[in-house]
Regions:
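Active-site region of the double-stranded beta-helix
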Residues: 1-111, 124-195
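Pseudouridine synthase
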Residues: 120
């Protein structure tokens, strides 16, 4: 459709500089929470030939599912006390369990509300029926080794990290992708909540 009606679909001005909208709209309804992960910022995504990925969630009326809460960010004290590597690196090296979530904050998935999530923010979406608008990229780094007994392959931790970075810093390379200040924002809810 874009090849035939590019100006009509994208608008003349936008079509001059863009080949596509670069956005996807998804509706998801998972039986379990999605793993704790992040989408790399522009400067990191481009290193692996990809685009960064921003997301926005809107929670629909029903069903909420068994875990209608989403984990976002990290506790502010972790960054304030500069304990990111001390706390997170052992989880990434050991790669088991889901206890890494205890260092994040869970927010209820309230129908009619949602969240905006720039690239670089850690998150583990809940099970509420969700309308998600996202940039069209699959770039990510997964930091959670297991969800409710289901093992997650460690390759998802470093799949979108350069081979050089992984060889040099291994699991610590993932921690360099995280926007720690944004993840520890004491006003995270106020700055990202959509109503």
């Amino acid at each position: 459709a874009l090849e035939v009606c590019k100006d009509e679909i994208l608008g003349h001005k936008y079509a001059k500089t863009h080949d596509c909208l670069g956005r996807l709209l998804k509706i998801y309804d998972f039986g379990t929470r999605i793993f704790y992960h992040l989408h790399q910022k522009d400067e990191d995504a481009i290193k692996v030939g990809m685009n960064s990925k921003e997301e926005a969630y809107h929670f629909l009326d029903k069903p909420l599912g068994p875990h209608p809460e989403t984990f976002f960010g990290v506790h502010a004290s972790i960054v304030r006390e500069n304990k990111q590597n001390e706390i997170f690196l052992p989880y990434l090296e050991k790669w088991e369990g889901e206890e890494i979530l205890k260092y994040s904050k869970a927010y209820m998935n309230i129908p009619g509300e949602g969240f905006h999530l720039p690239a670089g923010l850690l998150h583990a979406p809940g099970t509420a029926l969700t309308l998600e608008l996202q940039e069209s990229s699959d770039v990510m780094a997964v930091l959670q080794a297991e969800i409710e007994g289901l093992k997650i392959g460690k390759d998802l931790l470093h799949h979108h990290i350069t081979g050089e970075a992984w060889e040099k810093d291994s699991e610590a390379a993932v921690l360099d992708l995280i926007d720690w200040e944004a993840n520890a924002d004491p006003y995270f809810y106020e700055n990202h909540h959509l109503s």
